[in-house]
Amino acid sequence: MKQERYSVLSLNLGKPQTLEYDGKKIETGIMKRPAKSAVMLYRENFEGDGQADLVNHGGPDKAVCVYPAEHYPFWEEFLSRPLSNAAFGENLTVAGLTEENVCIGDVFRLDEAVVQVSQPRQPCVKLAKKFGVKEMVLKVQQTGYTGFYFRVLEEGRVSPGANLELLSRGEKGISVQFANRINYHDAKNLTAIERILSEAALSESWRASFMKKKDRLLPVE
């Protein structure tokens, strides 16, 4: 297999903070800052990082949030403002690794750690609240610029300037882009749903969601 390496432009960490939106206070872990030194990556998160909503964020299948730097120019134009790394609450801002060319089940070495793509990121309302744009979640779904999650196969220290080195490809070759398209735009495509479900590395939450989609499409006996 051809050796593939991708640059981590920024390693971002942050504990939950309180934001105010429409007169209401919310707890969120979306506010992150670039790390200046190496930190440990554990099974469920980076040392010094955290999530407020542990039902929809975090956990073994969503230990590391990744976002492609390639999308930043689009969002800067859409939002009419400059954006810095970590603007989308991602742990890793990466170059060259997008929803189009990364597949569920892909395994990477990240400095001392080993990680695996588990699912696309599912945009939540806190993105809209952070940017003050109500249609933000819908726009992320429409563009497919979601980012994705890693689970941690081997814990280890990660430096801010680390690279992602591809070790193996997902068995079924299901790109994050493909999974997003079926989830948001073609949810009655039974053949595609069954293909996605055939990927053993798919996260538990996305597997449950696609099983529900499949059950709705099967004839009632």
Swiss-Prot record:
Organism: Bacillus subtilis (strain 168)
Protein name per Swiss-Prot or TrEMBL: Uncharacterized protein YflK
A single GO cellular-component term on record: cytosol
InterPro entries attached to this UniProt entry: Benzoxazolinone_Detox_Enz, MoCF_Sase_C, Pyrv_Knase-like_insert_dom_sf, YiiM-like_3-alpha_domain
PROSITE patterns on file: MOSC (PS51340)
Gene3D superfamilies: PK beta-barrel domain-like
All residue ranges annotated as the MOSC domain in the record: 33-167
GO MF, one annotated term: oxidoreductase activity
Pfam hit, one: YiiM_3-alpha
Signal sequence, renumbered to the chain: none
Transmembrane regions listed in the UniProt entry: none
